[in-house]
From Swiss-Prot:
Coiled-coil ranges (or none): 1167-1199
Start-end of RING-type zinc fingers: 1306-1364
GO biological process, one term: positive regulation of protein catabolic process
Gene Ontology molecular-function annotations: ubiquitin protein ligase activity; ubiquitin-protein transferase activity; zinc ion binding
Domain of life: Eukaryota
A Pfam family per the record: zf-UBR
Sequence positions bearing Phosphoserine: 343-344, 1199
Its EC number(s): 2.3.2.27
Protein name according to UniProt: E3 ubiquitin-protein ligase UBR3
Transmembrane segments: 761-781, 919-939, 1807-1827
Amino acid sequence: MAAAAAAAAVGDPQPPQPEAPAQGLALDKAATAAHLKAALSRPDNRAGAEELQALLERVLNAERPLAGAAGGEEAAGGGGGGPGEAEEDALEWCKCLLAGGGGYEEFCAAVRAYDPAALCGLVWTANFVAYRCRTCGISPCMSLCAECFHQGDHTGHDFNMFRSQAGGACDCGDSNVMRESGFCRRHQIKSSSNIPCVPKDLLMMSEFVLPRFIFCLIQYLREGYNEPAADAPSEKDLNKVLQLLEPQISFLEDLTKMGGAMRSVLTQVLTNQQNYKDLTAGLGENACAKKSHEKYLIALKSSGLTYPEDKLVYGVQEPAAGTSTLAAQGFAGATGTLGQIDSSDEEDQDGSQGLGKRKRVKLSSGTKDQSIMDVLKHKSFLEELLFWTIKYEFPQKMVTFLLNMLPDQEYKVAFTKTFVQHYAFIMKTLKKSHESDTMSNRIVHISVQLFSNEELARQVTEECQLLDIMVTVLLYMMESCLIKSELQDEENSLHVVVNCGEALLKNNTYWPLVSDFINILSHQSVAQRFLEDHGLLVTWMNFVSFFQGMNLNKRELNEHVEFESQTYYAAFAAELEACAQPMWGLLSHCKVRETQEYTRNVVRYCLEALQDWFDAINFVDEPAPNQVTFHLPLHRYYAMFLSKAVKCQELDLDSLLPDQEMLMKLMIHPLQIQASLAEIHSNMWVRNGLQIKGQAMTYVQSHFCNSMIDPDIYLLQVCASRLDPDYFISSVFERFKVVDLLTMASQHHNMVLDVEHERSMLEGALTFLVILLSLRLHLGMSDDDILRAEMVAQLCMNDRTHSSLLDLIPENPNPKSGIIPGSYSFESVLSAVADFRAPIFEPGGSMQQGMYTPKAEVWDQEFDPVMVILRTVYRRDVQSAMDRYTAFLKQSGKFPGNPWPPYKKRTSLHPSYKGLMRLLHCKTLHIVLFTLLYKILMDHQNLSEHVLCMVLYLIELGLENSADDDSEEEVSMGGPERCHDSWFPGSNLVSNMRHFINYVRVRVPETAPELKRDPLASTSSDALDSLQNSGTAQVFSLVAERRKKFQEIINRSNSEANQVVRPKIPSKWSAPGSSPQLTTAILEIKESILSLLIKLHHKLSGKQNSYYPPWLDDIEVLIQPEIPKYNHGDGITAVERILLKAAVQSRMNKRIIEEICRKVTPPVPPKKITAAEKKTLDKEERRQKARERQQKLLAEFASRQKSFMETAMDVDSPENDIPMEITTAEPQVSEAVYDCVICGQSGPSSEDRPTGLVVLLQASSVLGQCRDNAEPKKLPIAEEEQIYPWDTCAAVHDVRLSLLQRYFKDSSCLLAVSIGWEGGVYVQTCGHTLHIDCHKSYMESLRNDQVLQGFSVDKGEFTCPLCRQFANSVLPCYPGSNVENNLWQRPCNKSTQDLIKEVEELQGRPGAFPSETNLSKEMESVMKDIKNTTQKKYRDYSKTPGSPDNEFLFMYSVARTNLELELIHRGGSLCSGGPSTAGKRSCLNQLFHVLALHMRLYTIDSEYNPWKKLTQLVEDMNSQVGNEDQQPEVPILYHDVTSLLLIQILMMPQPLRKEHFTCIVKVLFTLLYTQALAALSVKGTEEDRSAWKHAGALRKDTCDAEKCYEVLLSFVISELSKGKLYYEEGAQECAMVSPIAWSPESMERYIQDFCLPFLRVSSLLQHHLFGEDLPSCQEEEEFSVLASCLGLLPTFYQTDHPFISASCLDWPVAAFDIITQWCFEITSFTERHAEQGKALLIQESRWKLPHLLQLPENYNTIFQYYHRKTCSVCTKVPKDPAVCLVCGTFVCLKGLCCKQQSYCECVLHSQNCGAGTGIFLLINASVIIIIRGHRFCLWGSVYLDAHGEEDRDLRRGKPLYICEERYRVLEQQWVSHTFDHINKRWGPHYNGL
């Protein structure tokens, strides 16, 4: 048999064998295996080995299994049972052989016993739930499986749960990655010492079999691989091969799970080079093997980085003089050795594009190994297996197998080296892959396990040149998508940048490689090698330069751009991930003095790269106009390393800075970005589309800002501190295009800016200067100060949740940097600056999360508008911060008006940056400040309060940071000889402030008003002399000077400048001929900055001479200038503060201020209105008029809404609602008047034009969820916990009805109970009324309006036109009747007997069939709506479908449902009294009319009318019982009395008279009381009954026997004893239930409790029908108060009487006779069915309030049980598990497995459990979803973290705890049916949930 099997395996053409019994075959295999094992155990085992090889050769022949995959389908479909069977057979053989003839399971167990189990190593794939503990982690990538996490002790640790993105492995037990204290119990013990050695013979067979098995697998992989054709991707073919191989790979995976012993055998097999050589060499004779080997060689071909097909596009340039030779030899991307690609070039088979032949030389002195360039050579199975894993694009099974082996240390090292060896090949495969996302995840899944271990990373860095390989591979990867840069000089640029539109960047294909690079740089030892290696640094800077200037934006000036490119996403992601994150990784290792050398290296090569870049883009001195790139990674590297050098390494800044010319160049592009930001916000780039705004926002956004805008501003601060301040300031205003605006003239012409942009650009320029001079992030602030400033800025904009703060505070963006969010300093700073506001509810139901809000002292002392401006993504946030600041000042009484941004003192500058303050003390800035102050004072156009604010801010900054050479007293008033060249004598602001400027020469258009009033028309020599001496200057003659200076510097230092001849781009571009003629005018000014400030004070305050120097009254202010009153205020305060500071700093200033104040201030010149301004004013006037018209209209509408608003439409809190008055309240008016909210008319409802109430009809099962226990049930959180719904109100009523239907006539049963406990129809209204015809046209307009949110007009849904509450029907108001009319009905003196007759007579009158009117149509229509609201199963309980009795039952049950629900809304009792608050704005009166109208169409045959049985004695009782062949009617004592009440009332003609109502209640109370006595008698024991019978019999003859409970109880017992009711009780029943000790008090309590539900419903009904108020009372007196209210208790009766219930009785006929009659029906029934008879008598009357399930405190408890729970239908774990919070059912959200008739499970369950309302907790998201009919909404979460925040989708994975308050609100919305009104975001679910 073995021979036959073997022969079949070889594939000889054999006749089909008759199938042998499997068992025999197994025995045979076992015998062969045992024989071979014995043979191999001998000392000379050569023969055994050969025999085994021959067997394996046959069994594992590689020819057949993949024939189906590789060679078409025939083989697979062909005979012999297909390849599957043969493979299974081969695997069976392998298992038998490994076990050596024993059982395979036993073998596995034996091997497991030798597992040292030091590491967990459990491998998981994407979406697996794992944990990360930062307290225990050494590497930030550390993760634990759930089991190890819960087995370890992490209490109080900073941990979180996360859903794995790419897969991972458990690190428990690995002390390289985590601290031992965090190991779980299983991996804590280093148990290897206790494990005995593995017996040699146990794994001997494995050592023989596995090499052959793995070789066979490799042959399959070779055989199955076909190079993908150029046109079609081959994924399908690859997947087919992999599917066929799945059993083999699973087999290997199972072997790895056997533990350490088996893993070490596998390691030997996989890494043994001899084995590999022997097996792969001996292939000569086998043709098939040859073919597979050839395929392998073809596949290997493209594995190196050398491209033989590279086309030479540009020759390699010789290295330019002065550039680093290394850079030139290496990949000199920045110096332009890479040409543009010819787009017609086909990609070679490798998918890389030819990019010029480059000299390939050694990358660094350390690179001895050239193997990265060459084709791979494999020396072991492991190497080839990894090769195929890559080739097949990382199949999940293979990845898992390779990772499962990692706990074996020897394997881990070998595998890591192999992975590094294949790194370039991985990159090439990844680039070509069509599934790069999946592949990326799988690569990282592997690499993160290898590179997170520092020791291992260091080892492969040393032994395998890991760093060289990574950098080279990254460089090569990016080279395939380079294009010529168009920045600056488009034609002559030699710079190449990445093309952000390429898939490589767009799809983030590079991220796995960058992620690995960042990971290894997080290890100090590896990073140090990188920073020491000059060659690597050069290469890396070349790599970074590929991103320098990418995604260039060119401003559209004519028409809107046609296609808005979205490439900026790719650009920002690339800079952050590929440039910034590695930079942060390197920076984290440059923290101490000892690492100075590293910083010097980076700075040096960075500057070289920058110099190369400037050369390559051909940059001279001016940036090209209308161009901006946000990407300057080289600048940012340079800036960040400079900052680190000064801050942490005590390096001298000047030693790292280049010459002045380079500094001037360095500042240009970052400054261009700042100017462009202002342009973008001024809408100057509007034609470029929204994406340019997106770029401006991303640049400052929290995840990017500290890698982008912060380094840019820091670099500008460094340049400003070292360059000439006048040059810098003039450059800023030039860049911002506002130079022309800075003139004293009232008119000017700006050649580079439209007038409408001037103001915002000027604001931008000044704001930028303020930020530049105020910001200290890199200039001396400590990390904690920075954190505090960032936090305060964010909190000032808005209150924030903890998680949003964590997200908004810019942190080191390198995830491996070890800076942990939520670390100690974050929490301590947060508690210092903010107060926590617990989660709250706002009226209307919107839920707030836990928020942090700034403390009062933070607003007072730390609010920093500059930081806020820097960090706002949206401009509105700045306004929000100011509004909040204003509110604080008003609340705290510090300032009542509209404050200006406060001036905040800055932390001191680091000495290296002192030069920055020279900007504040340069003449150019002082000229600008002077000019702007003057222009503001003279009301020139385009100047705003914001400009003034910034001007004053800059002056104050200058005074705070006074210049060092402060010998200002000696510099007298400044003689004329000092100021020929400029306006001011010196550069010190303190002295320049008092310098008077008399005349200024300006260039103005000829039309300017200045020319008309030239003060110096006479040309006398005196005048000219004085002009000469007054220091007149044209503003910004300095600009030209600085330009000259810059040009000189450049010419001096740039030896090659003569080679580069290019026209200088004019800085002011303008259309020819567009500029008007300018002429020179001379203005008389005669002001100083001080005088302008004082006049400004007058202008701002609106009073002449308003400024009075405070030191004249109180000299103290000069000594103690920090006066709190100046801290907060408006412009006036700011001016006062500045003048005081100026006076404090200089006696001269103080004197001049006093002098100016003494002079009478001349009035400000009147404002002339120009034509343009007049136009603006007209516009304003028109706007104002339009506004007034709008106000009028709004006021009119508001008056309509007033009544609605007054009732405080707070649907959330029923207890404080005021009812909406539906009708007018004057009792003398006979007819109710209604307002129509659509047409606004008032009037009564009529037959022809009925008015209706806006109502929402909904099916409800809330009543059915009531239980007899007040404690809510708990959500099951273990298998053994189950919820059974036997004790719910719905279940009990269901059982009762089916019991009645089994024994009694169906039509009678349907009148004996109520339905609607499940699926009852609840009607609620907002209280607004409308004409029904108006409503129809309103619906029509909604139908035509396509923009509908969340409701379906076709289903009749709409929102109330006034209050927007959701509704779906209109309930007609019956004409005439007014509730209050019934109040003044005359008291009735008729006897009870007369009233009983009247009731009977009125019920007997047939209801008049309504005439065909609009009203009757509407009544019919609304009845149809009510029926359609609930499902058929909830309204059809009759045995004969469609029976009228059923209709009848449904209608009165609707009334019952609404009354019972109102009771529940009132808390289950009527103790609180009051109007119908909890019933919302009740519509019961109107509902009653509709129901009564329809019920009167049916008549109950007077024979069957229960009223007869209640009020008359029957002559022949036997006729009632019914005979044998027909079922009897339901005995009256089994009837539900409340149902009887509703039947009786609805059968009466409406409106009902109060006396008839009271009569019906009195009659029914007698029946109810008798039922109570009967139920009590059944509850008592035999002894109780005999005692009660005896006691009552004694008093039977007293006068009040009919009102004595003892007598009546005694009589009921004696009557019921005639049947078998009491005989059934066995002794065992008594033993089970502990008997109650009955006392007279407890019996009275029982009777009252039995009757109370009826009294409550009757009282509510009386309240609604007759408008009587409900009395409020204590709980214990509820019975007596309600009885009095209903007229059951005589008014003179003492309510504190202990036995009061019987006193309410008013028997219509002799009590004992009628009781006898009622009891006879029962005894007849119990003759046959005693047990059922007794069950029907005991009715559960006291239902407690309904509750949702009780949830556990900690969400993890729910999550751990349910997220792994399997679906009962498909037994798989659902993707989106959910649990119903009403009944605890586990459901699959959106699960197709549980779909029935196109309804998914949640929708179906919501219909079955809640009649259309479902409340589900989504396990994987922690949120609650509400289903209401055909709509659904996300409600929010009832589980919050320690900071009061939701964690939707468990993204943060922090522990969550129940928020009781939220859960109560959810429950209350469920009970009060207000989901539709409170939750606003509804959408259709299309039955797909």
